């Protein structure tokens, strides 16, 4: 369910909102763009270690102080059984920001799980998107040699 909210905003802000909506494309309207930005702003207020940014796949939440989208943080955190302190020992990010990413995931699990799933395209799907894509294997021996110079 939704409600109508009437706001009086400066003309310059309307122009900026229209420009933002055009940049997003896909039939984005001023109203949809405004609602999206309001939702993002509320989420950033509720989760201090999170910020929304433009990315090649659209706007998505990132962990502040990093180049990692929340779905990427969660993929890593799963390797640490979602233990922010353990993860912080191996990664150069404040434990508070890692915790914020995990809390954000707890609140928006379905959305983040969908982003993780979207990232796991198979080779055939990738080939359709990137026709020049070539698949090759690196022998395990070479991987070990590079890991232990």
Regions found by a protein language model. Name each.
Residues 1-11:
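Short Lys/Arg-rich basic patches
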Residues 11-29:
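Surface-exposed, Lys/Arg-rich phosphate-binding patches that contact polyanionic backbones
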Residues 20, 86-89:
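Short alpha-helical "recognition helix" segments of helix-turn-helix
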Residues 27-49, 53:
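Short, basic amphipathic alpha-helical segments that act as recognition/interaction helices
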Residues 27-29, 42, 91-100:
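Short, basic interhelical loop/turn and adjoining N-cap
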Residues 48-52, 111-123:
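Short Lys/Arg-enriched helix C-cap and helix-to-coil transition segments
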Residues 60-63, 116-149:
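Intrinsically disordered, low-complexity basic tails/linkers immediately adjacent to helix-turn-helix/homeobox/MYB/SANT
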Residues 66-81:
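Short, amphipathic alpha-helical "recognition" segments used to contact nucleic acids or chromatin
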